[in-house]
């Protein structure tokens, strides 16, 4: 199964040069270098808690700011997930998880439906986490959703520390993605939709 559920995406623009390699049936092994340390840390969470093998290399115009690289990594990773899922046969499709980190608690609910949508409710009081602009968290997920074709709801239940809130968000996201993309043995090779298809619109 793993040989069919992996993909590679290469994306080069005038602003960034990005490669992503993913195996959905992995062991949480990751090699990640985006030039944005906090984003690297969050992407490691996706790999580690989602048990996705993930290799990401990004070169971008971070001498200007992190926006282009952050967004383009979200685009490439979303495309990689969509490509690895293929027709989405046999997957559980839906995923949800509550992740705590100290005082923070975040809920993520998602549907690998082929219908991109993001509802995002994180209240991040700090403008930056280290050197990372906290506005870029939402921008990452917008890019991911639009290119993976998932419906994603992110809800902050409680929390005050921006780092804790964002990390809890990525941990919940990774576990929800793991749940949604895992193979449901009772479905065999059927597509989990009454329409008989799931497509990225």
Curated annotation (Swiss-Prot):
One of its GO terms (cellular component) is cytoplasm. Its main location: cytoplasm. It is found in: Cytoplasm. One of its GO terms (molecular function) is imidazoleglycerol-phosphate dehydratase activity. It catalyses: D-erythro-1-(imidazol-4-yl)glycerol 3-phosphate = 3-(imidazol-4-yl)-2-oxopropyl phosphate + H2O. It comes from the Bacteria. Keywords: Amino-acid biosynthesis, Cytoplasm, Histidine biosynthesis, Lyase. It is an enzyme of class 4 (lyase). Pathway: Amino-acid biosynthesis; L-histidine biosynthesis; L-histidine from 5-phospho-alpha-D-ribose 1-diphosphate: step 6/9. PANTHER family: IMIDAZOLEGLYCEROL-PHOSPHATE DEHYDRATASE, IMIDAZOLEGLYCEROL-PHOSPHATE DEHYDRATASE HIS7. HAMAP family: HisB (MF_00076). Belongs to the imidazoleglycerol-phosphate dehydratase family. This is Imidazoleglycerol-phosphate dehydratase.
């Amino acid at each position: 199964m793993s040989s069919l559920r992996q993909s590679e995406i290469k994306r080069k623009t005038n602003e960034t040069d990005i490669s992503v390699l993913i195996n959905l049936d992995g062991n949480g092994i990751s090699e990640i270098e985006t030039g944005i340390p906090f984003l690297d840390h969050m992407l490691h969470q996706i790999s580690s808690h989602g048990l996705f093998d993930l290799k990401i290399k990004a070169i971008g115009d971070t001498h200007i700011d992190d926006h282009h690289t952050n967004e383009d990594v979200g685009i490439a990773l979303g495309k990689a997930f969509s490509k690895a899922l293929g027709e989405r046969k046999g997957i559980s499709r839906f995923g949800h998880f509550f992740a705590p980190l100290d005082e923070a608690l975040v809920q993520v609910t998602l549907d690998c439906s082929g219908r991109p949508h993001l509802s995002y409710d994180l209240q991040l009081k700090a403008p930056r986490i280290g050197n990372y602009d906290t506005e870029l968290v939402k921008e990452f997920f917008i890019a991911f959703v639009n290119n993976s074709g998932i419906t994603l709801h992110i809800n902050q239940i409680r929390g005050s520390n921006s780092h804790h809130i964002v990390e809890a968000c990525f941990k919940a996201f990774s576990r929800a993605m793991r749940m949604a993309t895992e193979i449901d043995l009772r479905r065999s090779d059927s597509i989990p939709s009454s329409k008989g298809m799931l497509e990225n619109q």
